A protein has these predicted regions:
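Conserved P-loop NTPase "ATPase switch" module shared by AAA+ and STAND
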Residues: 79-105
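Accessory nucleic acid-recognition modules appended to NTPase machines
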Residues: 188-348
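Conserved NTP-binding/hydrolysis module of P-loop NTPases
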Residues: 48-84, 278
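Walker A/P-loop nucleotide-binding motif
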Residues: 24-43
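Amphipathic alpha-helical "lid/sensor" segments that cap RecA-like P-loop NTPase cores
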Residues: 149-201
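N-terminal pre-P-loop "Q-motif" helix
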Residues: 3-18
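Domain-level recognition of nuclease-like catalytic cores that cleave nucleotide substrates
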Residues: 398-440
Length: 440
């Protein structure tokens, strides 16, 4: 609830600033995708400070005034009536951006200026014909989750955020008194909020979700180039391109330039975020019944697989964010960028690196250990050392080594060298790295 209290204080500051100075807008858009807690925040604010709340959900916008206040046929009449309240209330309007017929509602809103403070709860920022403030609600992060659940292991926090994208509505489904594996069975059940969230979002965005489900399932299971998706789905490539653009517009698609099997740089397509990857890979094929009969051993096997397919990918994103912010801890001679696909996924004398970058005086090596249950092992570093020093002396190489677990003692000793940075999950969630998670 600390997150909600923080947003509530931010909203209260907007309201207070407006009434004290009259120089700030009389309306705020409270933005956040489904499940971020917009309605929870409105409820919390109303309990603390009073006000009014109206939802346009399942209502024709033109008909809504009659529902909200008997005898009011038009929005201007409704606003005139509630504007007579003497205590200058804060008025919340929920589900506003669901409506295509909201022109009269928007045009009539200025009648409340000076009489009330208006908060619009929306998923996406709306264009309005008058000034407004914005509060953007974002997802929970690993540091937030660990702060609220101090007994929670960092690895389980990583897993939780990885498969929920930190969406509060989904995170709260977890019982952190149980193991991560024990949480999966009720989480993936056909009547759980985890299962229903995807269905609801797909129906909201598409008239025929079934068409897009095929492509999202294909992407989640390894068909990531447009030619592969076309072959998998049976759709011509031009139709795939059209559907991919629609998925992108809905915020459900991410693209990455990376090497294909032949080493050529190609566009690869993925469901956006770990929740959608998890849902389409593990929940969608069996429509929520996958885990109902699974026993402890099978659940643990599923956790093992998810660690390799979902969790490690999220961990890598955290590592890249840390690297962009902190590479100067080992490299002081200039600026580095790590987004060139030609420098990603490079083999050096039989050892694969996540990134290899040549500079005038050094070679930069990045290795992210892809077993999230382990620390960086001695044998792996010895292979790295042998492969890289065959190209260039050790002191001319700079190594960034990441692992979720604490590295072995041998590798921990190596971190004392100026050209080696060893980073684990526990150090990543420190206070100084909060923005590393906020960028995800």
């Amino acid at each position: 609830m600390e997150r909600i209290r923080s947003y509530r204080a931010q909203l209260y500051a907007h309201v207070r600033s407006h009434w004290e100075s009259k120089s700030t807008p009389w309306i705020t858009q409270l933005c956040g995708k489904s499940g971020m807690g917009k309605t929870t925040l409105a409820r919390s604010y109303l309990e603390a400070f009073n006000g009014e709340y109206f939802s346009l959900r399942n209502l024709d916008a033109a008909f809504a005034p009659r529902i909200f206040l008997s005898g009011c046929k038009l929005w201007k009449d409704f606003f005139a009536e509630i504007g007579e309240t003497k205590n200058r209330p804060v008025i919340f309007f929920d589900d506003v951006d669901d409506k295509n017929d909201k022109k009269d509602f928007i045009n009539a809103l200025p009648a409340l200026a000076g009489k009330a403070y208006v908060v619009l709860l929306v998923r996406n920022l709306m264009e309005l014909p008058f000034p407004f403030d914005v509060i953007q609600m974002t997802a929970m992060t690993m540091p937030m989750l660990l702060a609220e659940n101090r007994a929670l292991e960092p690895l389980d926090a990583l897993r939780t955020i990885a498969i929920t994208d930190g969406i509060p509505e989904l995170v709260r489904l977890f019982d952190f008194q149980k193991s991560f594996a024990e949480n999966l069975s009720p989480l993936f059940a056909h009547d759980s909020a985890y299962f229903c969230y995807a269905e609801s979002e797909l129906r909201r965005n598409f008239r025929t979700p079934e068409t897009y489900n095929i492509l999202l399932y294909g992407m989640a299971t390894g068909y990531n180039r447009i030619s592969q998706l076309s072959e998998f789905s049976g759709f011509p490539q031009n139709k795939c391109d059209k559907y991919l653009k629609a998925l992108d517009k809905a915020g459900l698609l991410e693209t990455e330039q990376k090497k294909d099997a032949a080493g050529h740089i190609r566009t690869h397509y993925y469901p956006k975020g770990g929740y959608w990857k998890t849902w389409f890979r593990y929940v969608f094929p069996s429509q929520g019944r996958y885990l109902e009969v699974q026993k402890e051993e099978a659940l643990q096997q599923l956790v093992d697989e998810m660690d390799k397919t979902i969790v490690v990918e999220y961990f890598k994103k955290v590592c890249w964010n840390w690297l962009e912010k902190n590479y100067h801890s080992c490299y002081w001679d200039g600026f580095l960028k790590f987004d060139d696909p030609k420098q990603r996924d490079v083999m050096v004398n039989g050892v694969r690196f996540d990134c290899v970058q040549e500079t005038k005086d050094h070679t930069i090596y990045v290795k992210i250990w892809d077993n999230v249950r382990e620390g960086f092992p001695k044998e792996a570093f010895q292979k790295i050392e042998a492969a890289t020093t065959a190209v260039r002396p050790f002191y001319e190489n700079i190594y960034f080594l990441f692992s979720a677990g604490r590295a072995c003692n041998y590798v921990e000793e190596v971190r004392n060298l100026e050209t080696v940075s060893v980073v684990n999950l526990k150090s990543l969630v420190g206070q100084k790295n909060k923005d590393v998670f906020e960028k995800l």
